[in-house]
Curated annotation (Swiss-Prot):
This is Enhancer of split M2 protein. Residues 1-30, 64-86, 137-164 are annotated as: Disordered. Changing residue 212 to E: In strain: NVIII-m13. The lineage of its organism: Eukaryota, Metazoa, Ecdysozoa, Arthropoda, Hexapoda. Residues 1-25, 147-163 have a biased composition (Low complexity). Pfam families: ESM4 (PF15952). Changing residue 47 to C: In strain: NVIII-9. InterPro entries: Malpha/m4/m2 (IPR029686). GO terms for biological process: cell fate specification; nervous system development; Notch signaling pathway; positive regulation of Notch signaling pathway; sensory organ development. Part of the Notch signaling pathway. Keywords: Developmental protein, Differentiation, Neurogenesis, Notch signaling pathway. It comes from the Eukaryota.
Amino acid sequence: MYLDTKNLTASSTSALTAATASNSKSTRRMRNVWKPLSRLLKVGGKGRTAQATLAHPNNVDLNNTQQQQQQQQQELLIEDDTKSTPEESIHKYGLELRQLPEEEQVSLTQPPNTPTLISSVHVDKVSAQSCGNCQHGRNCQHRHHSSSNINSSSSSSNMNSSSATQLPSNLWDLQLPLQYISTDNGTFFWANTQDRVDDDLLHALLCQSFSQLPGTLC
């Protein structure tokens, strides 16, 4: 059998060259396709690191970002409070109170029907025994018992006892520092002492001597 070795060698060489050329072309084509994909897969692009301060990172659930922002703001506020002086803190607290809605603000005004304390009273001094002959008896509302000027004040608790009538000491079995004034609105009693007076004892004491005092006591 005759073999054409020359042509056989040439054909095999050309086949290998064609296969190598096709393989190199496909490799280059795959490389051109893969490079852009690899760039897209890298976060931040080639040669740059991912920014950690993004509002919505790619690997974080968007529903959790709002809570993280609130926590960061609270931490910043705490740091600012620790660095600020007491005067600045008071000023900032006042500004926050002004920004509160009206229903959330604490009402500093007194509610209606708030009891007030008498700070000063002017009365005409008349002895209690002068009411003994009064036709009204224990319900005496004689004009010399009326007060001509009553100033009520809720900010002062000091009584002006010099202008009031002192009860005679012989009316009481117990020596209590009691004083009273009789006005058109009724008879008012108080004690010039810092110690608390028993209300029940005071009421019983006044009821025993109601006949010698103006106004209805019991």
